[in-house]
Amino acid sequence: MIALIQRVSRASVTVEDEVTGEIGPGLLVLLGVEKDDDEQKANRLCERVLGYRIFSDAEGKMNLNVQQAGGSVLVVSQFTLAADTERGMRPSFSKGAAPDRAEALYEYFVARCRQQEMNTQTGRFAADMQVSLVNDGPVTFWLQV
């Protein structure tokens, strides 16, 4: 399971001219689900995303996680993160989970974030989405479990 996380000043996702999720300061989480992923990996990734210390403390050091910084999370499904790009000029998506399984794990990940009392907004699984963000830093990390 892969999360590309970006520290943002604000972010939103729109589907068919409807804003489905919008946050102020926090994390934009682009989430990719691979074939061998399961609930245990989703739990671990959720723990890492919410606990990752990439927000500045009073001394300007990256020492606070999103919860400590009072931020929110916007989770957007992105199957292209599971692409195999090692060869050729066209990505292969053979490493990605089947759509039904990917959606179930995406929803599970979102539920785990919400269980941690995290303000969690979302896109719409498998939809054509427009994601807008202001990357703060920029600060972007690839987390994989």
From Swiss-Prot:
Signal peptide: none annotated. Coiled coil: none annotated. GO terms for molecular function: D-tyrosyl-tRNA(Tyr) deacylase activity; Gly-tRNA(Ala) deacylase activity; Ser(Gly)-tRNA(Ala) hydrolase activity; tRNA binding. Its main location: cytoplasm. It is an enzyme of class 3 (hydrolase). Keywords: Cytoplasm, Hydrolase, RNA-binding, tRNA-binding. Belongs to the DTD family. HAMAP family: Deacylase_Dtd. This is D-aminoacyl-tRNA deacylase. It comes from Klebsiella pneumoniae (strain 342). The lineage of its organism: Bacteria, Pseudomonadati, Pseudomonadota, Gammaproteobacteria, Enterobacterales.
